[in-house]
């Protein structure tokens, strides 16, 4: 929450954390054994919204989730949340195409490039995530 004294990952030592079961957040946490061992307790929930509700009710000190998911939930659901600048792990997204369908891949990439150049991607990002989370392809 915005009024939390947690400002960096180190501040989570001994704290109770919620995350969605079988999520990329859980995988990232499991890959950082020392960090995971430093936590007080980890509560797994069925959904990210359930994890955020645990935070809102005060049953956990923080929620671990993908930044894009967090920004979306904060922007669209509202709430008095903050996202730490420091990440536990980096994650990138991509679009998959049927192997060999280079024509469709190239058309989609050309459209994405045009939207990045004219600022449309940035505008969409700010609308849905509250900030520009786009990544340059160059």
Language-model segments: what does each one mean?
Residues 1-17:
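Flexible hinge/capping segments at coil-to-helix
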Residues 1-2, 20-23, 47-48, 64-71:
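Beta->alpha turn/N-cap motifs
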Residues 4-5, 42-57, 90-91:
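Short helix-initiation/N-cap motifs at beta->coil->alpha
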Residues 12, 55-56, 95, 108:
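Hydrophobic residues within well-ordered alpha-helices
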Residues 16-19, 63, 96:
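Short, well-ordered beta-strand segments
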Residues 24-43, 82-84, 113-138:
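Ligand-binding clefts/hinges and TM-proximal coupling segments of bilobed small-molecule sensing domains
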Residues 28-33, 54-57, 61-90, 128:
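A ligand-binding cleft/hinge motif common to bilobed small-molecule-binding domains
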Residues 71, 75-113, 131-138:
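Periplasmic-binding protein-like
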């Amino acid at each position: 929450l915005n009024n939390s004294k947690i400002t960096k990952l180190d501040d989570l030592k001994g704290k109770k954390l919620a995350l969605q079961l079988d999520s990329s957040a859980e995988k990232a946490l499991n890959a950082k054994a020392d960090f995971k061992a430093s936590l007080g307790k980890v509560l797994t929930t069925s959904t990210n919204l359930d994890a955020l509700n645990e935070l809102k009710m005060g049953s956990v000190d923080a929620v671990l989730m993908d930044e894009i998911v967090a920004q979306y939930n904060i922007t669209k659901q509202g709430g008095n949340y903050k996202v730490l600048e420091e990440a536990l792990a980096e994650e990138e997204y991509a679009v998959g195409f049927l192997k060999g369908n280079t024509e469709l891949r190239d058309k989609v990439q050309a459209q994405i490039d045009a939207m990045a150049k004219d600022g449309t991607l940035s505008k969409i990002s700010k609308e849905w995530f509250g900030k520009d989370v786009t990544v340059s392809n160059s």
